[in-house]
From Swiss-Prot:
Compartment annotation: Cytoplasm
NCBIfam families: murD
Gene that specifies this protein: murD
Record's keyword terms, sorted: ATP-binding, Cell cycle, Cell division, Cell shape, Cell wall biogenesis/degradation, Cytoplasm, Ligase, Nucleotide-binding, Peptidoglycan synthesis
Protein name from the UniProt record: UDP-N-acetylmuramoylalanine--D-glutamate ligase
Amino acid sequence: MITSPVFSGQFYAVLGLARSGMATVAALLASDAKVMAWDNNPETRDRLQQQYQEAIDKGRLVISDPMIADIFGISAFVVSPGIPINRHPIAALAKERGIPIIGDIELFAQAHGFWERHGRRCPVVGITGTNGKSTTTALIHHILKEAGLPTLMGGNIGLPLLAADPLPDGGVYVLELSSYQIDLTFTLDCDIAVLTNITPDHLDRHGGFEGYRKAKERLFLLQSSPHYAVIATDDIPSQVIAKQSAAHLVTVHADNISAEDQVNWPNLQGPHNAQNAVLAMAVAHILGISDDVISKALISYAGLPHRMQKIGERRGVLFIDDSKATNAMATAPALAAFPAIHWILGGVPKTADLDPCKAFYNHIRQAYTIGQAGPDYAQLLREAGVNVVECGTLEKAVRLAAEEAQPDEVVMLTPACASFDQFSDYEARGQAFKKIVEALD
């Protein structure tokens, strides 16, 4: 795990004990810090107590709610990014007591700063954006591995960052960073900061689009001038951020990638993946990786689950899981990638319209709506001349689409919505899709 003398002797209150919270508690205790930890789930608290009874007995770990406990001497509140600070009373308490609210990425940044001051040079690549950041992160990580460099992928993807073993000198950290995580980070000076795109998302958390855009922008405002900002300027908000950056600026566009090149990358199809690829290539060039290694890595990249993932084929019909597409801007390039699609969409809507998808309605053989957004989105599509069936559930939609689809057509789950009305997250939705497809006759 990642530990640091920076944390030694400090007193932290960790709020939220899911994977990253548990890893934070472990890293802080191993760094000789004192910890107050809390989660509203009593079973989670019980597991923590069983795991760290010795630390509790020695007074190094206190399981208590910081909202009601004695917090004298607390150095910082370390909050899970899933906790909405704008609606949680911890924000008022922190302001009243003058205690900073940070996240595990900020703890990593402080540890990383200590390493650099003591001669260990490990570049950090931070990737943010509305859509494509997971694929871009994973692709950069894959290219680095193919180049033989020590590298670690973390942040908003994979295992909790503080649970990982630190890299040796010269290793490269590749971090996917959500707007929530950036909000809780104050000293992360990325050697290379990457922006995929910005479209409306998480607006309730950030008080509107401008607040969301500024959260993304902070990653670049934290950079010092010797470092690099790699920004895809295919949208206006990203262009605005590019103008504000004090770092060495590298701008790219999705159309920098030719169709002739992209056809050779089996798991990087569609215009959105052209953007992901050109960003990853720019980062790799900055890090001194050869064109030959980059080219081979683009071909061998296996892709991520639930992102244009080919699930299987039945009677000449291809089934694709794009459950990660939780807004219309993410769904649009998936619809652009194939000419004959049976489109499964719906869930918890993030916007009232599907405007980014309109240009590709001519690719839709039929749409199948599910979940909360189903009736409204069905009406929108009918008004646009798209054939629609209101299915309600994912299982009904998949089975009907499988019956209707003809050879050489595609059944695609690319929902343009969040999943929380019917599933715990987009991963559970994608796994359910896969199980239903596998159970088809």
